[in-house]
Amino acid sequence: MKAILSSDRKWGLGYQGRLLVSIPSDLRFFRETTMGHVVVMGRKTLATLPAGQPLKGRTNIILSRDPEWTVRGATVVHSIKELMEVLKPYEDDDIYVAGGGEIYRQLLPYCDTAYVTRIDMTYQADTFFEDLDESPDWEMVEEGDE
């Protein structure tokens, strides 16, 4: 399983339910990287997507605490245990965790790779990712050009 995200210098992810900044090249990287794969996200993250709809060309799995909530074009699960059952048929390399903050916190222990676009600025944020720079469990193995 892989996490995919963009964060500011202080590992900020978002503010008031939105990304801190929209970077076209990062959005393109996200699209190209996740296309044809499984994308796991929370209900609130789904709501921030265009028209609040699942991502086209991907298998969308949405985590929601609301047992009555459904969305067309995605599989909805209500617990990590249920998510793991739904993910059994897929290879770990085909699964991308796309947020939000609570979903990252719950699933980071299952991830072996994190694609992180670090924005060299600090923004007002109310949602954060774990500081991988300070985590002994993570190391940077490759750094991009941008």
Where are these regions (language model features)?
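Enzymes that bind and transform nitrogen-containing heteroaromatic metabolites
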Residues: M1-E146
